[in-house]
Amino acid sequence: YCIKVYSQNSRGLRATNLEEVLANMKIQGIFAWCLQETWRCGNSIEKHEGGYVCIHHGPKEKLSRRGSLGVSIVLNPTAYSGFKAAGSKCDYYGLRILAITIKLKDTKGKDIFIRLISAYAPHSGCTDEEKEQYETDLSRAINSCEDNDILIVGSDTNASLSCIKETDIQDAGVQRPVGKFGCEHT
C-alpha cells in the first residue's frame, strides 16, 4: 500500500489556493495534504466536489488584521472514507496542531491505522512560553498515536538552516547554527 501525503505552509488559505491544492491532489493522486498558517478561524469540515474534504482548525476569531495560525488537512475520497471508518474524530492540541486517524485495509484485508498530524511551529519572534507550549502540544499529539499506528506529521517547523564558517565566533547565549554543514544563511 502506497500513499502520497504533502505538507505546505499556505500563508493564508484563500479559495484560489484551496482550488489549486484540490486540483493537484486529483492530478497527482495525493491521499492527504497538510496545510499550515491557513489563517482560517474555528473548526470545520468542508466538503468539496468529487468527495474531497478539508478539515480546518484555527482560533475562534482573527488574532491580527491579516490573520494568523490555523492548520488544515485535505483528504481525497479514499482518505475521507478511512477517516469516517476510524470514527471521524478530530483532535486539537492548542491552536497550532490538528490530528486525525484514518483506517484503511492492507492487501490482506488487515486494518491499518494512520495517525495524521498537521502542525505549525512558532517562529523565532514568538515567546519562549509559546514555543514550550507548542512542544508540549506536539508531544501530546505524537503520544496519542497507538503502538501499531503509522504516524505521519506534516509540519511547518519554522526552521532556519545555515552553517557556521571556520571564522565565525558565536556570542554566548545566542542561538546560532550548530555545525559547519548546511547552506549559508541568507
Where are these regions (language model features)?
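A shared catalytic/ligand-binding motif for oxyanion handling
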Residues: 1-186
